Amino acid sequence: MQILADLLNTIPAIDSTAMSRAQRHIDGLLKPVGSLGKLEVLAIQLAGMPGLNGIPHVGKKAVLVMCADHGVWEEGVAISPKEVTAIQAENMTRGTTGVCVLAEQAGANVHVIDVGIDTAEPIPGLINMRVARGSGNIASAPAMSRRQAEKLLLDVICYTQELAKNGVTLFGVGELGMANTTPAAAIVSTITGRDPEEVVGIGANLPTDKLANKIDVVRRAITLNQPNPQDGVDVLAKVGGFDLVGIAGVMLGAASCGLPVLLDGFLSYAAALAACQMSPAIKPYLIPSHLSAEKGARIALSHLGLEPYLNMEMRLGEGSGAALAMPIIEAACAIYNNMGELAASNIVLPGNTTSDLNS
């Protein structure tokens, strides 16, 4: 689909001049050079994003939660009933799930999007982008057609861009779908080249005696569908799921606007791997929130070259980690914009990164 290809070629480059200017500004603040550590690095990263116009700041915040069922659930790779996807999606509309509570704490809006829930009728209160009632069973068929994947990517990209036009400057991604760590593991295994046994974890508390079956299912899915690891759309269509496609769409949409997107857990790492295969230019816009407790998390993050800011031993998904990390983004912006400057206080510090204003 030519429209998608055109969009992928228009993602703006990071502004290195703005980043250098931000570095000089931060070095001149009331503190020893480098003493605010990763907050400084984060502020400089934000300054380089064209959508923020060279000044790290946060306007409106949004967490986009992609909800979908998966045909591979039939293979016994999850212990939760498939109906839990629809039930939890409804609970999200009531604001009672983990991501809703954490997003409210962070001052972010949660957008609950149905991209493939297996119900006869759309669920009231959800944003309806449903492609089908669940993806195909990747152990016996592709998850979806390439055309379906490309159309959903474009729909989500357009939705994300519209939110940006309405003042959202910080995006978070999340997902909801029983059995979705299985296609996520298949994506990670395909793109990183690691064996399924190295990346398949217990997901939502799968008993360890069922893990061998899950590993076998992932291996069968890859062998049967033969996804091309260099083609992110192909990987998503063959061994992914509608929720994973949707997450990738948010990343591409935010990056196309020059804006940051907070990753969540393992599902978002998998989607990021696929999105970066489509457009490596999006990588500087990705901010890892927390280290997922899922087995293949480190492998995926290492391939992406990302180091999470938090390690809370979380594996809920939903966008909970992205929401939790939003105040860290705001803190980086606050130190950049609100701290005083050394020159204004007639303080001269030696260029020693270990020096301390109080010593």
Swiss-Prot record:
Keyword entries, A-Z:
Cobalamin biosynthesis, Glycosyltransferase, Transferase
Molecular function terms in GO for this entry? nicotinate-nucleotide-dimethylbenzimidazole phosphoribosyltransferase activity
Entry annotated with the keyword Cell membrane:
no
Please name the InterPro entries in this protein's record. Answer: Nict_dMeBzImd_PRibTrfase, Nict_dMeBzImd_PRibTrfase_bact, Nict_dMeBzImd_PRibTrfase_N, Nict_dMeBzImd_PRibTrfase_sf
Q: Which CDD domains match?
A: DMB-PRT_CobT
Protein purpose:
Catalyzes the synthesis of alpha-ribazole-5'-phosphate from nicotinate mononucleotide (NAMN) and 5,6-dimethylbenzimidazole (DMB).
The name this protein goes by in its record: Nicotinate-nucleotide--dimethylbenzimidazole phosphoribosyltransferase
Provide the gene name from the record: cobT
